[in-house]
């Protein structure tokens, strides 16, 4: 198992299917992990030539469960998509692939449900 694969085992299950890790920082006080949503359109939008990537939302910081006595901060951002036809900019509501039994803080759930 690669180190990067092993690291995902300590984060909420299914997160690696939605995000890619872009930065990791360990300090004396905490672990900070930056995650960007993977660029993936819904099946419906994939067939729509008017939907194009429009960058990312601002990072939202969520405190996850501690590891080895240090708080873990996940700095996550979602993709922004632009519908050229309607001029609407949107983000998808995200759902973890295996939500049942996954323990998430209210802050974490709010990030996934926010359509930004």
Located regions from the model:
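Short, positively charged, Gly/Tyr-enriched micro-motifs
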Residues: 61-116
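Long C-terminal interaction/binding lobes of large macromolecular proteins
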Residues: 2-20, 25-32, 37-40, 107
């Amino acid at each position: 198992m690669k180190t990067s694969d092993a690291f995902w085992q300590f984060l909420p299950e299914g997160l690696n299917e939605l995000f890619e890790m872009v930065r990791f920082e360990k300090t004396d006080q905490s672990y900070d992990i930056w995650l960007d949503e993977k660029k993936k359109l819904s099946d419906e939008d994939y067939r729509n030539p008017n939907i194009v990537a429009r960058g990312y939302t601002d990072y939202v910081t969520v405190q996850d469960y501690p590891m080895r006595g240090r708080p873990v901060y996940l700095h996550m951002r979602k993709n922004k998509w632009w519908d050229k036809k309607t001029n609407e900019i949107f983000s998808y509501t995200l759902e973890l692939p295996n939500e049942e039994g996954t323990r998430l803080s209210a802050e974490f759930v709010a990030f996934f449900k926010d359509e930004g």
